[in-house]
Amino acid sequence: MEQYRIIKFLKVDGYERFAKIQMLGNENKNYKVHFSENDEYLEEKQISQKRKPGDVIGGNIYIDLAFCAKKADSDIMFSQNINNSVRVDAIVEVSRIEDEYTIYAKTNIIDDEILVEFERKVDCEIGDRILLDGSLELEIEE
């Protein structure tokens, strides 16, 4: 589990939160992520009473709703080029295969392996580098 500072909220919708966060201890690691607040429902213009910019939250980053475009021969990388979007494009290296929909991979998003959950069955082997896109998610640990 890593610690992150909330820089700003990009959008709130019911229990859903979209925020820009920064890894504590590494100002160069900024992400746009989605997470859920199951105990605070907000309409679009409401302000959270539970969390605000500057607060520190702990959790694990993972990639969800991933789509594997193809195998890649390039360096490990990631980008989030769409304004206010949690979409991530990445080249990752498969390090563990849990099942046909789930892998763990080496990435430069976080220092540890990252969990990747695919929308469809994915055909890959340990050591493969794959190009994917998905949603960058934060599973909060209280």
Task: Describe each region flagged by the PLM.
Residues 1-16, 77-100, 129-132:
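Structural detector for short beta-strands of small beta-barrel domains
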Residues 26-50, 108-126, 131-134, 138:
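Beta-strand/loop nucleic-acid-binding surfaces
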Residues 60-87, 134-142:
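OB-fold/S1-family single-stranded nucleic acid-binding modules
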